[in-house]
A protein has these predicted regions:
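Gly/Ser/Thr-rich phosphate-binding loop
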Residues: 3, 7-68, 80, 87
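Glycine-centered tight turns that cap/initiate beta-strands
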Residues: 11, 19, 43, 78, ...
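Active-site glycine-centered loops adjacent to acidic/histidine catalytic or metal-binding residues
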Residues: 27, 51, 73, 130, ...
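Beta-strand->loop->alpha-helix junctions that form or flank phosphate-binding loops
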Residues: 47-54, 73-75, 178-181, 223
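Short Gly/Pro-enriched turn/cap motifs at secondary-structure boundaries
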Residues: 66, 70-76, 120-123
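Conserved ATP/PPi-binding loop(s) of AMP-dependent carboxylate-activating enzymes
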Residues: 74-78, 88-119, 157
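AMP-binding/adenylate-forming catalytic core of the ANL superfamily
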Residues: 102, 107-108, 115-118, 131-217, ...
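Acidic/polar alpha-helix N-cap and adjacent early helical turns
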Residues: 243-250
Length: 250
């Protein structure tokens, strides 16, 4: 969020950032477009990594070496990371739930034994709840949160894929894709879009999505808002959006 907001400021130049040593990102997956724009505007390549309260840092792109846009790098020394689905490790490149194990992982939730048992395996693996995949060279990509996965008509839709496409449309500042209850499909894909151009219409977004997305991935509804709800850390609150629009199709 901070990077996208700074990119909107014309004062952001290579000269302004000349004395900066390093820019990092790790609170939420960064779009490739944001990463690329930042490098072009400032001359700095953002170092993206992946961590959470329960584990501190899990992975990082290298300080010296290739920092790959769209990835959070590789597991840090001493930390194991695997991608799981239905208690089985998935094949390379497949999407599943990220689990981590190492000295960085917490002991459990304070006075919450049930939650601890649900998310921390007896052998030390922590179930992060994040969806991800690992490429052939070991770089990890975050696809989204498991709870944000949309199942529509029996098909899985990963919101980040749809958001990445929508965010590339001219006139779009940012977007959030959610699943809402639907009488026919179980869940319907809905895109909440913040325009950067007041002339942007829902029809333009819908047409662009129809060109590049499979039918089941295309939003059934496009909602235009002036801003997305966020918490104090700047993370988009999709739960709040789901609550606000829960009855959109019912």
């Amino acid at each position: 969020t901070f990077y996208t907001r700074l990119l909107q400021d014309p004062r952001l130049t290579p000269e302004l950032c000349a004395t900066m040593r390093l820019f990092v990102s790790g609170s939420a997956p960064m779009l490739v477009d944001t990463h690329t724009q930042w490098q072009a505007r400032t001359g700095h390549t953002i170092l993206e990594r992946y961590g959470m309260t329960e584990t501190n840092m899990n992975t990082s792109n290298p300080y010296d070496g290739a920092r790959r846009p769209g990835t959070v790098g590789m597991p840090l020394p001493g930390i194991e990371l695997r991608i799981m689905d239905n208690a089985q490790e998935v094949a390379q490149g497949d999407i599943g739930t990220i689990e981590v194990r190492g000295p960085n992982v917490f002991k459990g939730y304070w006075k919450m034994p049930e939650k601890t048992a649900e998310e921390l395996r007896p052998d030390g693996w922590f179930i992060t709840g994040d969806l991800g995949q690992i490429d052939a060279e070991g770089y990890v990509s975050i696809v989204g949160r498991g709870k944000d996965l949309i199942i529509t008509g029996g098909f899985n839709v990963y919101p980040k894929e749809v958001e990445s496409l929508i965010d590339e449309i001219d006139g779009v500042l940012e977007s959030a894709v959610i699943g809402l209850p639907h009488p026919d499909f179980g869940e319907a894909v809905v895109a909440v879009v913040v325009p950067s151009d007041p002339a942007l219409t829902a029809e333009v977004v819908q047409a662009a999505a129809a060109q590049k997305l499979a039918k089941f991935k295309q939003p059934k509804q496009i909602l235009l808002l002036s801003e997305l709800p966020r918490n104090t850390m700047g993370k988009v609150q999709k739960k709040e959006l789901r609550n606000i629009y829960a009855t959109l199709f019912t």
